[in-house]
Amino acid sequence: MRPMHGTTVLCVRREGRVVIAGDGQVTLDKTVMKATARKVRRLGEGQVVAGFAGATADAFQLFELFEKKLKEHARSLPRAAVELAKQWRTDRMLRRLEALLVVADREHVLVLSGAGDVIEPDPVANGAAVAIGSGGPYALAAARALLAHSSLDARRVAEEAMKLAAEICIYTNGNLTIEEL
């Protein structure tokens, strides 16, 4: 049995608002297994939003670990992210987890990987955006264009960019879960 794959998660920051949007499609090989999965959630007593791309069970384990790191480091998103990335990279069992995380609070947007990466995207005209997953490049390109050439708020930028990604990427659908700070 092949692993489930394919998703799109987009984070947009604009004018003090932060939005993470994730599509709902889960595929197994060439079959859509679920259309309404929730790949985005709130953490840190509602002060952090997070989304994942990759194996679902792996992502849930990483969400739990990240929640613990947030508590250990007084809800400092950058510190918790670095500590999780270090543990993820060095722990023999965690190293096998296949997922990417996008985490954000009102001040930071970060991408975490099992390779130990903690990446904060560069700001673009009138905001910032980062995307992961199979539809990530499409959503990111659309979000950057909308940030640069429209006055849409963060939520509308995310919705429109995800709509475009769903039209292009066969592993992405239009059933969105959106969390906003």
Swiss-Prot record:
Its EC number is 3.4.25.2. Its main location: cytoplasm. Signal peptide: none annotated. It comes from the Bacteria. One of its GO terms (biological process) is proteolysis involved in protein catabolic process. The active site is at T7. One of its GO terms (molecular function) is threonine-type endopeptidase activity. Allosterically activated by HslU binding. It is an enzyme of class 3 (hydrolase). GO terms for cellular component: HslUV protease complex; proteasome core complex. It is found in: Cytoplasm. Na(+) binds at A166, C169, T172. Keywords: Allosteric enzyme, Cytoplasm, Hydrolase, Metal-binding, Protease, Sodium, Threonine protease. Pfam families: Proteasome (PF00227). Disulfide bonds: none annotated. The keyword Plastid does not apply. It catalyses: ATP-dependent cleavage of peptide bonds with broad specificity. HAMAP family: HslV. A double ring-shaped homohexamer of HslV is capped on each side by a ring-shaped HslU homohexamer. The assembly of the HslU/HslV complex is dependent on binding of ATP. Protease subunit of a proteasome-like degradation complex believed to be a general protein degrading machinery. NCBIfam families: ATP_dep_HslV, PRK05456.1. Belongs to the peptidase T1B family. HslV subfamily. This is ATP-dependent protease subunit HslV. It comes from Anaeromyxobacter dehalogenans (strain 2CP-C). The gene is hslV.
